[in-house]
């Protein structure tokens, strides 16, 4: 009779109540049960209160209850009816399988998108490279054109300087040749009594002597004595007597070259003060009317001083391009 009453009483108790009673009979606390089962105290409390945590799957909850029952020596068969009520098994939601054709279509679309992206990327890279090459080629052609112009101007200057040297030599020859007749006249005046027939004139003597030969003969003939100069004649003025030291121009442009460099300098009147190639370790001093317009083929190879102050060319050196700048009276270079 007592056994049947106890069995009915156990059936009337819920799963959580039976687990709590068994725990209390063994003298265990919720903390001790949680530590042995490696669970949270809140989970043990929810199991004893017949609560199913929302964030806990029913499969895990049933496993926790079985472990709790084994700990407090309760057969699992007695708790089976309560488990079906407290933690019923739910059918897992299985996502429908996608069609193979749908996945293939999506993969094909992704492939076209990736191909188009790579195509656009290649086009952008190609256009950037073409733009850089055109700019680089234009700079090289400009430098080549500048060098050709400077070579042509140097050739013209050399061809024009030849007549000037010839005329100078001719003038020197003409200035020195009259000394011979003077000596001949003086000799004739010293011997007036001698009368002799005039010798035949050699045609070669009357021939015009080229300026180069006249210069050589005059240089070979010794200078006349001091008696050939009249007593009342004054000495000729020398060139050094009229030499004066020019004043330093405050707008002077000084350039020192550390490597070969093409250069063109123009002043405010449009006059080209210099246009050509400067060699390494060369110096150039220019004076004109400010502002000056400069065009430099290799900015890294030249150091410029204007009004006694250096001119900054770092922005042209960093970009490695032809420098075009203007130096005004206030020394503010502008591109």
UniProtKB/Swiss-Prot annotation:
The helix-turn-helix (HTH) motif in the cytoplasmic domain of the N-terminus is involved in the formation of spirals to maintain the rigid rod shape. As this protein is anchored in the cytoplasmic membrane, the HTH motif may contribute to protein-protein interactions to form the RodZ helix, which is localized beneath the cytoplasmic membrane. The C-terminal domain may be critical for determination of the rod shape by probably interacting with enzymes required for synthesis of the peptidoglycan layer, including PBPs in the periplasm. The keyword Transit peptide does not apply. One of its GO terms (molecular function) is DNA binding. Residues 148-239 are annotated as: Disordered. It is a single-pass type II membrane protein. This is Cytoskeleton protein RodZ. Residues 165-205, 217-239 have a biased composition (Low complexity). PANTHER family: CYTOSKELETON PROTEIN RODZ (PTHR34475:SF1), PTHR34475. Cytoskeletal protein that is involved in cell-shape control through regulation of the length of the long axis. Residues 1-111 are cytoplasmic.
């Amino acid at each position: 009779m007592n056994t049947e009453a106890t069995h009915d009483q156990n059936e009337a108790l819920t799963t959580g109540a039976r687990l709590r009673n068994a725990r209390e009979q063994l003298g265990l606390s919720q903390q001790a049960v949680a530590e042995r089962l490696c669970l949270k105290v809140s989970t043990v409390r929810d199991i004893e209160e017949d609560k199913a945590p929302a964030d806990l799957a029913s499969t895990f909850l049933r496993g926790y209850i079985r472990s709790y029952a084994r700990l407090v020596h309760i057969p699992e068969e007695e708790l089976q009816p309560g488990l079906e009520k407290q933690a019923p098994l739910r059918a897992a939601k299985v996502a429908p399988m996608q069609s193979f054709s749908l996945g293939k279509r999506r993969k094909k679309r992704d492939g076209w998108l990736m191909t188009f992206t790579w195509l656009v990327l290649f086009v952008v890279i190609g256009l950037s490279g073409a733009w850089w090459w055109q700019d680089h080629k234009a700079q090289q052609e400009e430098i080549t054109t500048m060098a050709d112009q400077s070579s042509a101007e140097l050739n013209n200057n050399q061809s024009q300087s030849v007549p000037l040297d010839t005329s100078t030599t001719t003038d020197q020859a003409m200035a020195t040749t009259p000394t011979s007749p003077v000596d001949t006249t003086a000799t004739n005046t010293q011997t007036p009594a001698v009368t002799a027939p005039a010798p035949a004139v050699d045609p070669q003597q009357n021939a015009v002597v080229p300026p180069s030969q006249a210069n050589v003969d005059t240089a070979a003939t010794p200078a006349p004595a001091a008696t050939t100069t009249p007593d009342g004649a004054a000495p000729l003025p020398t060139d050094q007597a009229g030499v004066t030291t020019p004043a330093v121009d405050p707008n002077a442009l000084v350039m020192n070259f550390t490597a070969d460099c093409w250069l063109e300098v123009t002043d405010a009147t449009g006059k080209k003060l210099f246009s050509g190639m400067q060699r390494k370790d060369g110096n150039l001093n220019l004076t004109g009317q400010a502002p000056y317009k400069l065009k430099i083929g290799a900015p890294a190879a030249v150091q410029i001083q204007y009004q006694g102050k250096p001119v900054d060319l770092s922005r042209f050196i960093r970009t490695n391009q032809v420098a075009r700048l203007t130096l005004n009276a206030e020394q503010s270079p502008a591109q």
